[in-house]
Design a protein with these regions (language model features):
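Sec/Tat signal peptide C-region and signal peptidase I cleavage site
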Residues: 19-23
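Structural alpha/beta surface segment adjacent to cysteine/selenocysteine redox centers
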Residues: 144-232, 262-267, 293-302
Length: 302
């Protein structure tokens, strides 16, 4: 849909949630992002985007923004614009698309289309999802969550995800780290989680649950202390986990998980994939709908 002053006001509330977050830096355009344009794509200038934002949000004194990136969209003929919005509800990176003539902006997801729209992503996930897992590896249903331990929406979604996995013991469930750069201890949390997972698959799930429970008490300043204690509480040696989390190797693991998420189209946390089908705002999806999606995927996978 095209953006209007009325619709974008409504969309602002939706955008300022973790569910539509994009793992991008709050900095202005990076050189590699500027170089990503191709002759076939007409990219709007920073000045034009800023003017658009001013005309759209200027009446909202509490809303500020910063351009994160302007680059070609995954499909021809559209430019993808990522802008960090900040308001009373917090800070979040939102995305919209601009048509090649520069006359229209579009809010919404670009989703796969075709006779088998989820097959390509399903194959990538089956081959590349390497995080801690539960359930049989030969299951016809693969559920992959991309999560951020500092994201409140991820915490809110956990009961629904845990209930789904508990009710469907024959599915395979994999967790992939996807810390958002706008969260100041998320990357560290992901590093600790990675190390806990390597030490003990059982301890990993306890660590994730405990970290979500303690989420509001963790800050950038006390993250090492809190996460070390949580690792101890999960049944592994916290000091060893802290040492592991600080290594370049672990950073590489986390960076690889983020890159993998981007490669399968993750634009926010939590994102759940059920046999390649992407589901956001998980806590808002009724349990019976999630079960129906799993049952349908199981039938399709046979």
């Amino acid at each position: 849909m095209s953006i209007s002053n009325i619709s974008i006001k409504a969309v602002l509330t939706m955008l300022l949630t973790c569910g539509l977050a994009v793992a991008q830096s709050p900095s202005l355009l990076k050189p590699e992002e500027k170089a990503a344009s191709s002759p076939a794509t007409n990219l709007p200038s920073e000045a034009t985007v800023n003017s658009f934002m001013q005309q759209t949000f200027g009446y909202e004194a509490q809303v500020t923004w910063k351009i994160s990136s302007i680059k070609p969209a995954p499909v021809p003929g559209l430019a993808q614009v990522d802008v960090i919005l900040a308001g009373p509800q917090g800070q979040q990176l939102s995305r919209f698309y601009v048509t090649s003539d520069g006359d229209h902006a579009v809010i919404g997801e670009i989703i796969p289309f075709g006779a088998h729209p989820f097959a390509a992503v399903q194959k990538k996930l089956a081959n590349g999802a390497a995080g801690p897992s539960r359930g049989p590896k030969d299951s016809p249903v693969l559920i992959v969550e991309f999560g951020d331990l500092q994201c409140p929406a991820c915490k809110a979604a956990q009961p629904a995800i845990e209930a789904l996995v508990a009710a469907e013991p024959t599915v395979r469930f994999v967790f992939q780290n996807f810390p958002l750069e706008m969260h100041n201890w998320a990357a560290k949390g992901a590093a600790y989680a990675d190390c806990v997972g390597l030490a003990s698959n059982e301890a990993f799930w306890k660590f994730v649950s405990k970290t979500y429970d303690a989420q509001s008490d963790i800050t950038a300043a006390n993250a090492d202390e809190k996460l070390t204690a949580l690792a101890d509480g999960a049944g592994v040696k916290g000091a060893d986990i802290a040492a592991c989390a600080a290594t370049p190797v672990t950073k590489g693991h986390v960076d690889a998980s983020i890159a993998f998420g981007k490669a399968v189209g993750v634009t926010g946390t939590p994102t759940l994939f059920i046999n390649g089908r992407s589901i956001g705002n998980i806590s808002q999806v009724p349990a019976e709908t999630l079960k129906s999606l799993v049952d349908f995927a199981a039938k399709q996978g046979k």
